[in-house]
């Protein structure tokens, strides 16, 4: 049965609400090094780990499985070629997808192909019977000679696919941009990045908070949601 984008959006939003109060489920996160969350957190939790603590610990969903299938350096096309291994074999109920930071190395000419691949990821995830959630990658430090400059076009592609296919969107990029603008600190809030392309511990915590808000599980009384991480804003990335 075919649904309109609006019908998909309404259905998936309701599914996520039901999942959070229903029987045990499997949550799978796919993406690149930001999802994998290695090195740049310096031993602190990545956003997927914060999610697991919030859902399995604080919300008492102990039997839930949270799978981090992120791979450093991965692009959307890599997931498509390894979809069954990185996502399908876990029989997921919900799949969170975040790519773009590496994909943008293809430049402006690569945006159309990237958008098509996201479309295919959404369709293949839905074919599994799972609910898909798209995420925009957080901003990076834009430099003319940096291989990841020009990410904004890929962020817009994620938003476009989410709107066209009725996919729930976690817009990390918008949240980071809003805070950075309020601070006058550039493309990313001060202290949220560990290097020009990777969030540090504070950045991952803020990504988790954005995810919680999108899913409606943010709570000021939660230890995870109210955690504070001190950052050194005097040292440039």
Regions found by a protein language model. Give the residues of each.
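Alpha-helical cap/lid subdomain in secreted, periplasmic
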Residues: 10, 21, 49-62, 75-236
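Serine-esterase "nucleophile elbow" of acetyl-processing enzymes
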Residues: 1-72, 83-91
């Amino acid at each position: 049965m075919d649904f309109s984008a609006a019908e998909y959006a309404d259905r998936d939003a309701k599914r996520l609400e039901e999942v959070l109060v229903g029987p045990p489920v499997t949550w799978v996160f796919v993406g690149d090094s930001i999802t994998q969350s290695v090195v740049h957190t310096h031993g602190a939790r990545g956003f997927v780990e914060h999610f697991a603590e919030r859902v399995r610990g604080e919300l008492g969903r102990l039997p839930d499985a949270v799978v981090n299938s992120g791979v450093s350096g991965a692009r959307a096309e890599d997931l498509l070629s390894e979809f069954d291994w990185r996502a399908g074999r876990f029989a997921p109920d919900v799949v969170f997808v975040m790519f773009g930071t590496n994909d943008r190395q293809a430049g402006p000419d690569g945006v159309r192909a990237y958008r098509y691949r996201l479309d295919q990821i959404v369709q293949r995830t839905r074919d599994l019977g799972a609910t898909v959630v798209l995420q925009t990658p957080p901003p990076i430090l834009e430099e003319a000679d940096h291989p990841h400059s020009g990410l904004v076009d890929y962020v817009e592609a994620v938003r476009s696919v989410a709107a066209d296919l009725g996919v729930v969107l976690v817009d990390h990029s918008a949240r980071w941009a809003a805070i950075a603008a309020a601070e006058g600190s550039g493309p990313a809030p001060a202290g949220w990045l560990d290097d020009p392309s990777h969030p540090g511990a504070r950045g991952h915590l803020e990504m988790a908070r954005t995810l919680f808000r999108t899913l409606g599980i943010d709570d000021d009384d939660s230890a995870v949601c109210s955690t504070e991480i001190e950052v050194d804003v005097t040292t440039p990335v």
